[in-house]
């Protein structure tokens, strides 16, 4: 199925307030569970996976925040084997891309959420997840959700973890473990467009005073500082995902009343503008920061391939949310106990109005792990681990 662009940008405030109202009415009380991977991979395993980002890789940090952005209610996590199907705060039906990558690279456990009460001692050695639903590169991003962890805060939290590693291993061993045996994964940027620059009501002032190029420039300057701070804390192996085709998610297609084979042109154009400049930034950092490897993950093309040729990968739908309500694509109300739920969860590219299903995450993760330079460069993640 070919996907054509639409210049539509009809975003109704009524839809926005409906989403907020529904989120406020959700009362979730299921505690996160399931840290173990039960990994049987032999030798050469990843030491620690440090995961930064937004709801695409949040493993439960938002469970511990007073926020409108939460996923610790059923049927989220229904296919997450480590918890027996109990919701953990992941915004999908099963594993995130971060989970799958860590598992495939031989990590002993899933990276533990930084805010979890048991995130201490030896539990940190498999890695820590700092990602937060609603978080972005810019501090103002996601304020509609009340609370979230932006990238600046996430880096601050890693600074705390870094000191804990010194206490656990001693300074010399800790530095070696973090620099040589760990991977730093950053999946962020989509919210800076969806829940900042493009968000109705909140973004009017920003869009009036800043051109898209200026806003993207600010994003990249902030990201440069954040990545440099991690480098100064001994991070050396990085993978940074670009922004996916955010104009094609069920939420955007629904609120803009698009046909099945249309996407919101403006959102995708902004993502592509950012992505081109992100790749240049990573190339620059590879030259400027000795001993570092910044890997660029071309998530945009990977996801667009699934959306455009979904049937080739065994999917039945790349437009409708498996779990959600409202509109043609179930794209208005987030996944929760009262949501409509599809019967074949592994046949949908999108789990909810915003996030991929585990089936889609597996395909994307495998490409990042073993794919060629078209999707992951200059090396894939299996090679990055062994460097």
UniProtKB/Swiss-Prot annotation:
Glycans are attached at residues 139, 159, 380. Keywords: Glycoprotein, Hydrolase, Lipid degradation, Lipid metabolism, Secreted, Signal. GO terms for cellular component: extracellular region. It is found in: Secreted. Residues 1-32 form the signal peptide. Its EC number is 3.1.1.-. GO terms for biological process: lipid catabolic process. Coiled coil: none annotated. GO terms for molecular function: hydrolase activity, acting on ester bonds. The active site is at residues 55, 352, 355. InterPro entries: GDSL, GDSL_Est/Lipase, SGNH_hydro_sf, SGNH_plant_lipase-like. It comes from the Eukaryota. It holds the Pfam family Lipase_GDSL. Belongs to the 'GDSL' lipolytic enzyme family. PANTHER family: GDSL ESTERASE_LIPASE, GDSL LIPASE/ACYLHYDROLASE FAMILY PROTEIN (AFU_ORTHOLOGUE AFUA_4G14700). This is GDSL esterase/lipase At2g23540. It comes from Arabidopsis thaliana (Mouse-ear cress). The lineage of its organism: Eukaryota, Viridiplantae, Streptophyta, Embryophyta, Tracheophyta.
């Amino acid at each position: 199925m070919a996907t054509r662009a639409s210049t539509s940008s009809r975003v109704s405030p009524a839809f926005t307030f409906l989403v907020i109202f529904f989120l406020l009415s959700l009362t979730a009380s299921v505690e996160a569970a399931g840290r173990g991977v039960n990994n049987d991979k032999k030798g050469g395993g990843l030491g620690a996976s440090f995961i930064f980002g937004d709801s695409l890789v949040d493993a439960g940090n938002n469970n511990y925040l007073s926020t409108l952005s939460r996923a610790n209610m059923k049927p989220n996590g229904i296919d997450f084997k480590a918890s027996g199907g109990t919701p953990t705060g992941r915004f999908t039906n099963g594993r995130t891309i971060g989970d799958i990558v860590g598992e495939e690279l031989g990590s002993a456990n899933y990276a533990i959420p930084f805010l979890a009460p048991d995130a201490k001692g030896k539990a940190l050695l498999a890695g820590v997840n700092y990602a937060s639903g609603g978080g972005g590169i810019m501090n103002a991003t996601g304020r509609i959700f009340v609370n979230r962890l932006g990238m600046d805060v996430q880096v601050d939290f890693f600074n705390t973890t870094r000191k804990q590693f010194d206490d656990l291993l001693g300074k010399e061993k800790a530095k070696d473990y973090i620099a040589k045996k760990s991977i730093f994964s950053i999946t962020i940027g989509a919210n800076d467009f969806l829940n900042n620059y493009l968000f109705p009501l909140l973004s009017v002032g920003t869009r009036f005073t800043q051109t898209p190029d200026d806003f993207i420039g600010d994003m990249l300057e902030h990201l440069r500082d954040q990545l440099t701070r991690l480098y100064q804390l001994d991070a050396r192996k990085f993978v940074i995902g670009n922004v996916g085709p955010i104009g094609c998610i069920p939420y955007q297609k629904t609120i803009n009343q698009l046909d099945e084979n249309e996407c919101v042109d403006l959102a995708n154009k902004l993502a592509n503008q950012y992505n081109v400049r992100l790749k240049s930034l990573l190339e620059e950092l590879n030259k400027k920061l000795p001993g570092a490897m910044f890997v660029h993950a071309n998530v945009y093309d990977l996801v667009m391939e699934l959306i455009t040729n979904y049937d080739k990968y065994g999917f039945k739908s790349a437009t409708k949310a498996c779990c959600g309500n409202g509109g043609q694509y179930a794209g208005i109300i987030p996944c929760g106990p009262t949501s409509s739920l599809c019967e074949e969860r592994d046949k949908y590219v999108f789990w909810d109005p915003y996030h991929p299903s585990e089936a889609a995450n597996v395909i994307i993760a495998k490409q990042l792990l073993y794919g060629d330079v078209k999707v992951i460069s200059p090396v894939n993640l299996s090679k990055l681990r062994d460097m």
